[in-house]
Amino acid sequence: MASEGITEIDSGLIETNYDNVVYTFDDLNLKPNIVRGIFGYGYESPSAIQQRAILPITEGRDVLAQAQSGTGKTATFTISALQRIDENEKSTQALILAPTRELALQIQNVITHIGLYLNVTVHASIGGTSMKDDIEAFKSGVQIVVGTPGRVFDMIERRFFKTDKVKMFILDEADEMLSSGFKEQIYNIFRLLPETTQVVLLSATMPQDVLEVTTKFMNNPVRILVKKDELTLEGIKQFYINVEQEDYKFDCLCDLYDSISVTQAVIFCNTRSKVEFLTTKLKGENFTVSAIHADLPQADRDTIMNEFRSGSSRILISTDLLARGIDVQQVSLVINYDLPANKENYIHRIGRGGRFGRKGVAINFVTDQDVGMMREIEKFYSTQIEEMPADIGALFN
């Protein structure tokens, strides 16, 4: 409960006001078919956030949970939601919101896999797709809805999505969801849910303003917060290259590729125009490149992501659209062609490179004007970004 105060466990790595830690899936009192789905999905034992968050969520408590990118946040609320769903009740019982269509689709995929042996229906209600499909899904009955705020609110307003049986409201990437761009939509949706609805927020970062906002619609939440100065990404080697000025970045990128052998890489830029510029330039140098940004039609985005996942494209250039939650297994290198404008997006970007302990390398292109921002990032995450060594190629052999 909020009034209990925060205690530290695990040598200060985690702050929490909830003492129960469960070290095996078998001890979480889950439906046997969920455990079967968990093992089938490839999990052997719960991650740190799963050990602490699944139990209070399945007990119906409001939960504010924070963990690093790639530590199993999605499975945390997936397992919990599947446990709480009444399989005999065909109405919507759980609503999960995500900031991007891609993340919503990935969450749907995880729910489908872990819930493989349950009689549970899940539907992604996202912008850029046919409204007719949404309407048909809601009319036929769907127990878990994963969606983006705009489309979900539209379906509720049009009365196709009936919220009277919703008992769980889950926000993934809460720092992004509660930023100014989504806050109003979230509030509008929340006001249309039953007063007894359980609220669960999960995110990699929890700035103070977000923590304050959560008090408006959470009831004595269990808080499980990774201390900020421990919020570096294990397994990710972080480097910077001082390119001095913007005009030198492209030549630096080509020189870098001459010295390393990389299976696949994600390159982040801050604007759509920069993504398009860099894509054109790299294709001119005969690189196999894909590009993705928010203005692309949904079908095109899906095709591009599938091509990259299958390995037919070696370089994916993206804006921060991709930075939250998209798990591309083979990525060993992330390049910040531009440092993120928002330092809280840094962890989401470089987290693409080494999820669940897989090693990765992040290289930041830094102009003279960027040095201050890089120092801010280092301070914010209590980390050190080292100058790229001359023998960088050895890290990829």
UniProtKB/Swiss-Prot annotation:
EC number: 3.6.4.13
This protein's UniProt keywords: ATP-binding, Cytoplasm, Helicase, Hydrolase, Initiation factor, Nucleotide-binding, Protein biosynthesis, RNA-binding
Pfam families per record: DEAD, Helicase_C
Keyword hit for Transmembrane helix: no
Reactions catalysed according to its record: ATP + H2O = ADP + phosphate + H(+)
Localisation: Cytoplasm
Gene Ontology MF terms: ATP binding; ATP hydrolysis activity; RNA binding; RNA helicase activity; translation initiation factor activity
Residues annotated for ATP binding in this entry: 67-74
Entry annotated with the keyword Cytoplasm: yes
Boundaries of every Helicase ATP-binding domain copy: 54-224
Role, per record: ATP-dependent RNA helicase which is a subunit of the eIF4F complex involved in cap recognition and is required for mRNA binding to ribosome. In the current model of translation initiation, eIF4A unwinds RNA secondary structures in the 5'-UTR of mRNAs which is necessary to allow efficient binding of the small ribosomal subunit, and subsequent scanning for the initiator codon.
Protein family (similarity comment): Belongs to the DEAD box helicase family. eIF4A subfamily.
Protein name in the entry: ATP-dependent RNA helicase eIF4A
